[in-house]
Amino acid sequence: MTLTVTILGCGSSGGVPRVGMGWGACDPAEPRNRRRRCSILVEKRREARDAATTVLVDTSPDLREQLLDSDVRHLDAVLFTHEHADHTHGIDDLRPLVLTMRRCIDVYLDERTSAQVRTRFGYCFITPPGSDYPPILVEHRLTSGREVHIDGPGGTLAALPFRMVHGNIDALGFRFGGLAYASDVSAMPEEAKALLRGLDVLIIDALRYTPHPSHFSLAEALALIDELGPRRAVLTNLHTDLDYATLRRQVPAHVEPAYDGMTITTYD
């Protein structure tokens, strides 16, 4: 069985280019510098041409275009890393899929993220008084270190959430077989590191060159990559400081910047 992960977005919270600020150090002539907000699509298949079990991680504000570009016709589940706007505010763009599939979508959140998302988007879970819109989501709880299993046409996909420090809150990363996704992290606890040994691919936050209170800098990301020793590493959550071609030249051969639409194949 194989896993295919598509980078739907690899930009920082404002994307690249940023409204009112432009491209920064990024060359606008390089298509891989145009970055939507962070999200990935995970697909598990028994064989290459089989139907897939399909899981989305986060609903970015760019979700509509992300799903259209990847021709997503169904989802078996959505996993959320944390409650920040750049990871949740596209949630209503799941509604057309619910109408097409004729069923609600299973969403997985930790307790804090659930409370925040329900405050902002409660109508997605329960029809509010006076509304004719039915709910579109069915909630399930995520707990760090406790694997969840998502069934779909490609078989059961296992997702292992792990807790990370993200500035003054916690966020979740996920391990899917030989791949781990850690998009928003400023410190990686030892218990999480223990779950990230022996990876084929690590997708890791590397916001900018200089330190940031809520995200890894490039140097911090490279240090963790060196410590964990994945076969391959992909840098995501990239700010306007980080030009694709320049960054590609600066990192080791087994490390590369993400770009929107990038696909990664690994094992389940």
Task: Give the ranges of each region predicted by the language model.
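Binuclear metal-dependent hydrolase catalytic cores
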Residues: M1-A182, R248-Y267
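A conditional alpha-helix N-cap/helix-loop micro-motif detector
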Residues: N33, S60, V185, P211-L218
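Catalytic metal-binding/acid-base residues of hydrolase active sites
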Residues: D62, H84, S186, L207, ...
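Binuclear metal-ion centers of metallo-dependent hydrolases, dominated by the metallo-beta-lactamase
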Residues: G145, P189-D268
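Thr-Gly-centered strand-to-loop micro-motif
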Residues: P161-F162, A182-D184, I204-D205, L235-T236
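Active-site-proximal loop/helix segments of hydrolase catalytic cores
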Residues: N168-L172, F176-L202
